[in-house]
C-alpha cells in the first residue's frame, strides 16, 4: 500500500505512525538491537501491511488484471490506486478506525503531516527523500483526484526509467474504464480486511504492553 493507507492503518500513536510511514528505510533486523518498542512495532507493521497486501488473493487477482496494461509495474499501480480510492471512499472507510470516525480526510492528513514534521529526523530511506516534496506539494491530498495519481506516476516514471510503463498506464486511464473498475472493486473488498488485520497485528504484537498508549 502507499503512504496514505499506511498512515490510516497505523494506530493513533505518533511514533508508531511515523515509523510505519518510513518503514521501507529499514532493512534486515540489525536496527532492532537498541530500538525503542514504538520503532519496532511501526517498522514491523509497515512490513505486515505490505506482505498482507501482496499475498492477499484479491490483490493477486487485481494485479493480474492491471498487468495487461501496466506490466511489471502493476503492484505500484495498485498502491497508487489504494490512496486514490481511500480518498474517494473516505466517508465509508473512516469509521474503520475509531480515531478517524468523525474526521474529514484533510484534517487527518494535516494531523499526520504535523506528526511527521515533528519527527522528521527519524525518517529513513524513500520516505526521508520524498518527505520535503510530499509536504511542500501536499501529495497526499493531491491523490484525491485521478489527475493527482497521474502526476505521481509520471514523476516516478521520469525519475526511474525502468518503470516508464507506469506513467504510460495512468496517462491512458479514464475513470470508469476496465482497469479503473477492477482496482475499485479490489479496494472496496480488500481495504476493510487490511485495516482489521493491521489492528489485530498491533493488538497481538509482543511489545504492545511495553508502549504507552496515552
Predicted features by range, described:
Residues 1-214:
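N-terminal leader/auxiliary helical segments
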Amino acid at each position: 500500500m502507499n503512504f496514505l493507507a499506511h498512515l490510516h492503518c497505523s494506530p493513533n500513536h505518533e511514533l508508531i505512525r511515523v515509523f510505519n510511514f518510513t518503514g521501507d528505510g529499514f532493512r534486515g533486523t540489525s536496527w532492532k538491537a537498541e530500538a525503542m518498542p514504538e520503532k519496532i512495532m511501526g517498522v514491523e507493521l509497515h512490513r505486515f501491511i505490505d506482505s498482507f497486501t501482496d499475498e492477499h488473493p484479491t490483490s493477486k487477482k487485481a494485479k493480474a488484471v492491471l498487468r495487461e496494461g501496466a506490466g511489471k509495474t502493476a503492484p505500484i499501480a495498485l498502491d497508487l490506486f489504494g490512496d486514490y480510492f481511500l480518498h474517494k471512499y473516505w466517508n465509508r472507510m473512516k469509521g474503520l478506525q475509531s480515531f478517524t470516525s468523525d474526521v474529514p480526510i484533510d484534517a487527518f492528513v494535516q494531523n499526520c503531516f504535523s506528526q511527521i514534521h515533528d519527527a522528521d529526523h527519524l525518517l529513513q530511506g524513500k520516505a526521508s527523500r520524498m518527505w520535503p516534496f510530499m509536504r511542500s506539494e501536499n501529495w497526499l491530498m493531491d491523490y484525491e483526484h485521478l489527475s493527482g495519481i497521474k502526476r505521481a506516476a509520471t514523476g516516478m516514471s521520469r525519475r526511474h526509467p525502468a518503470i516508464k510503463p507506469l506513467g504510460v498506464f495512468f496517462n491512458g486511464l479514464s475513470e470508469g474504464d476496465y482497469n479503473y473498475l477492477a482496482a475499485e472493486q479490489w479496494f472496496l473488498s480488500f481495504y476493510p480486511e487490511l485495516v482489521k488485520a493491521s489492528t489485530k497485528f498491533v493488538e497481538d504484537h509482543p511489545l504492545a504492553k511495553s508502549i504507552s498508549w496515552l
